[in-house]
């Protein structure tokens, strides 16, 4: 009775699956027939195909054959225990899973080849359109000059005169090769959120909370501001370079101003009540603090009509 109840409960779902299977088999059969006719007519050349795709198609076909055999035995009331088709299905499935990473690596190249074979040309946004060409690295003017020199040589040979060779030519730098830029606004926003999360995870608040609730032993270190630590590392690197190369590196005005501002920031007391922005971790709106905004210099505008001051000559 229990088996009869299970059979009655599974009967509607089994009928639905059989109907879906019949529809899918009919659709696949029609697609295969149309492809076979096109291949036989010569619409799709197959003499130079990919062996990887051929092996994959053969494995999928064998998998479907064994699966159909199992469905037939199951519908006839047979047992699947120790069935040879089950072992073959497991083996083919393992091979297909091993081929999946290779399929992901070849997906772009295969799609590009298929699209090129169907349309006859590459896409406008294809990155391979912007690859460097050796012909673009050569100056067009130099080739024209060479042609003119050859024409002059021919004329001089005809008239009995010798042309002067080895004249220096003007150097023309090669043009820059265009690069496709396909970054969207969503990708830029994602990168900005990732930078905000990294900045929040490296803040002093998160570090202190981690040390408070962690079971690891406390690490005692010199608590300094990150920009002070970075500045000391740069100074040490500069000192090591000067001592090893026996040279004195010059410091620009911009570097001096940056060090001066860093010293002022480290000496101010407003940082005692300042907490880093961790809204990227809590799901809030990420915003920049006043200290994170870049400092812009005022552009000096020259005043017209004013002469430079000079030394007055004494009489």
Curated annotation (Swiss-Prot):
Keywords: Acetylation, Cell projection, Centromere, Chromosome, Coiled coil, Cytoplasm, Nucleus, Phosphoprotein, Repressor, Translation regulation. Part of the small subunit (SSU) processome, composed of more than 70 proteins and the RNA chaperone small nucleolar RNA (snoRNA) U3. Interacts with CPEB1 and EIF4E. Disulfide bonds: none annotated. One of its GO terms (biological process) is ribosomal small subunit biogenesis. Residues 13-41, 181-205 form a coiled coil. The keyword tRNA-binding does not apply. Part of the small subunit (SSU) processome, first precursor of the small eukaryotic ribosomal subunit. During the assembly of the SSU processome in the nucleolus, many ribosome biogenesis factors, an RNA chaperone and ribosomal proteins associate with the nascent pre-rRNA and work in concert to generate RNA folding, modifications, rearrangements and cleavage as well as targeted degradation of pre-ribosomal RNA by the RNA exosome. Its dissociation from the complex determines the transition from state pre-A1 to state pre-A1*. Residues 41-174 are annotated as: Necessary for interaction with EIF4E. One of its GO terms (molecular function) is RNA binding. It is found in: Nucleus; Nucleus, Nucleolus; Chromosome, Centromere; Cytoplasm. This is Neuroguidin. Belongs to the SAS10 family. Residues 124-169, 277-315 are annotated as: Disordered. Residues 295-315 have a biased composition (Basic residues).
């Amino acid at each position: 009775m229990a088996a009869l109840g299970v059979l009655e409960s599974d009967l509607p779902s089994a009928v639905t699956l059989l109907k879906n299977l019949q529809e899918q088999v009919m659709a696949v059969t029609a697609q295969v027939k149309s492809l076979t006719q096109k291949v036989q007519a010569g619409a799709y050349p197959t003499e130079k195909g990919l062996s990887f795709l051929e092996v994959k198609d053969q494995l999928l076909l064998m998998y479907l054959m064994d699966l159909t055999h199992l469905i037939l035995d199951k519908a006839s009331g047979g047992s699947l225990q120790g069935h040879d088709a089950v072992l073959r299905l497991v083996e083919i499935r393992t091979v297909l899973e091993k081929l999946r990473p290779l399929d992901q690596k070849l997906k772009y190249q295969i799609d590009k080849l298929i699209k090129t074979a169907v349309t006859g040309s590459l896409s406008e946004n294809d990155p391979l359109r912007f690859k460097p060409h050796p012909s673009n690295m050569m100056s067009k003017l130099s080739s024209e000059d060479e042609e003119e020199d050859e024409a002059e040589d021919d004329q001089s040979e005809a008239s009995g005169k010798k042309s002067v060779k080895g004249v220096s030519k003007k150097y023309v730098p090669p043009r820059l090769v265009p690069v496709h830029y396909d970054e969207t606004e969503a990708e830029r926003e994602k990168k900005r959120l990732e930078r905000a999360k990294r900045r929040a995870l490296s803040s002093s608040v998160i570090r202190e909370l981690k040390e408070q609730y962690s079971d690891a032993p406390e690490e005692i270190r010199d608590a300094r501001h990150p920009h002070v630590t970075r500045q000391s590392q740069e100074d040490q690197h500069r000192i090591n370079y000067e001592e090893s190369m026996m040279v004195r590196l010059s410091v620009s005005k911009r570097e001096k101003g940056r060090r001066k501002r860093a010293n002022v920031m480290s000496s101010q007391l407003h940082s005692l009540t300042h907490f880093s922005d961790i809204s990227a971790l809590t799901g809030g709106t990420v915003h920049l603090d006043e200290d994170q905004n870049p400092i812009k210099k005022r552009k000096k505008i020259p005043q017209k009509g004013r002469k430079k001051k000079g030394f007055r000559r004494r009489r």
